[in-house]
Amino acid sequence: LPVVVNPHGGPWARDSWGFNPEVQFLANRGYAVLQMNFRGSTGFGRKFTEIAYGKWGQTMQDDITDGVNWLIEKGIADPAKIAIYGGSYGGYATLQGIVKDPDLYACAVDYVGVSNLFSFLQTIPPYWKPMLDMMYEMVGNPEKDAQMLRENSPALNAERIKTPLLVVQGANDPRVNINESNQICLLYTSDAADEARSV
């Protein structure tokens, strides 16, 4: 089957059983949809949440890739017809997925996704400022963890992208600044492989 991988936002949130209109829309049109509660998702205990601290784009992303590979191994997914699509952290996971595993996905849709962990941490909304130290623990500290943040910022590794990509962003998004999308669009269109196109 063609598959749409749909990592949830947050990442400190979770997918749960119940009606989801986006998923139902895709399933109604013949797509299998993979949603997963990767490390860091809430509702599975403190340890499950905390093992994701400082692991954006790393083991959290590996959980998503492992799910996709499982679908391929079980014969559920057509390996040539796998898309990834998500918003907010799910948009980040979409971008990191096509950077880290450029041959895994046939296409990608990022909406309001973080593309540069440095600029994301610099532009958090005012109501998150009291939690900045906690954000540094959960995402990474720009001074102490600079190499890790650089390696896991899709915009700073856009030259690896070969996958056709659609980027969607609201101009006034209070949580994920429009600059996140501007960066990935600018770097993707200048550095991406010839066969990839941006919209």
Where would I find each of the regions flagged by the language model?
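Short beta->alpha connector loops of Rossmann-like oxidoreductase domains
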Residues: 13-14, 116
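Acidic helix/loop microenvironments that form the catalytic cleft of cell-wall polysaccharide enzymes
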Residues: 9-11, 89-90
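Active-site donor-sugar recognition loop in glycosyltransferases
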Residues: 11, 18, 40
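Short amphipathic alpha-helix adjacent to the substrate-entry channel of hydrolases
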Residues: 18-35
